[in-house]
């Protein structure tokens, strides 16, 4: 049985993944969770885990202007913590470190200027969330390339779009409420990618099962 550690005790994606595994792969995976708040996690022993999934993040953006304190918080949570956790995973011989990044590293589009992403699209983050996640990706790649990685820990970076499902937060719930109360829904083409949380959970399960690496 593969042992998996989720970094982020209150993450929607992390909680959904744990529930999905319990319902579909209960005999194949043992999933634990830990919070990265404070310093206690640094004393934990991760050597027993096959994979560590980092879903800790500061995500929701409700304004267009950010203070220096807010920007620092994005960087501290989304980048610095991610890199510190990766170093711990490597040093303790974890087989695989999975980092949940975001499609926001490619920029934020709108109806007048959509951002179409394919394999050749270059990162161009436009807000503190996207910038901090991209900074984390760059930092993680340097860590895995430059420190010797004697234990051969594999790095996986996943860049999901907006994730929806039961109990999700963000804009999707607003759309659901609108659809329920509006008798006539406009015929408007959707240009935004969305991913059902169970599909993301299944993908992560396969990534762990096959010990994959890369973006």
Walk through the language-model features, giving the residues of each.
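Glycine-rich "substrate-gating" loop/helix at the edge of Rossmann-like oxidoreductase active sites
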Residues: 161-168, 187-198
């Amino acid at each position: 049985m593969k042992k998996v550690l989720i970094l982020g005790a209150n993450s929607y994606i992390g909680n959904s993944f744990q529930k999905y595994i319990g319902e579909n792969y209960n005999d194949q995976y043992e999933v634990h969770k830990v919070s990265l708040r404070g310093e206690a996690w640094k004393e934990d022993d991760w050597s027993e885990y096959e994979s560590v999934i980092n879903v800790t993040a500061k995500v929701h953006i409700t304004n267009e202007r950010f203070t220096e304190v807010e920007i620092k918080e994005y960087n501290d949570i989304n980048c610095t913590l991610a890199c510190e956790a990766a170093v711990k995973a490597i040093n303790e011989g974890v087989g695989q470190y999975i980092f949940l990044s975001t499609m926001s590293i490619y920029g934020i589009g709108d109806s007048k200027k959509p951002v179409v992403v394919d394999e050749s699209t270059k990162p161009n983050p436009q807000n503190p969330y996207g910038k901090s996640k991209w900074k984390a990706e760059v930092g993680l790649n340097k860590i895995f390339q430059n420190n010797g990685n004697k234990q051969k820990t594999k790095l996986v970076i996943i860049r999901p779009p907006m994730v929806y499902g039961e109990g999700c937060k963000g804009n999707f719930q607003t759309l659901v409420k609108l659809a329920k109360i509006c008798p006539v829904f406009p015929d408007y083409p959707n240009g935004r990618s969305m991913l059902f949380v169970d599909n993301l959970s299944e993908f992560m399960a396969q990534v762990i099962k096959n010990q994959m690496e890369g973006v």
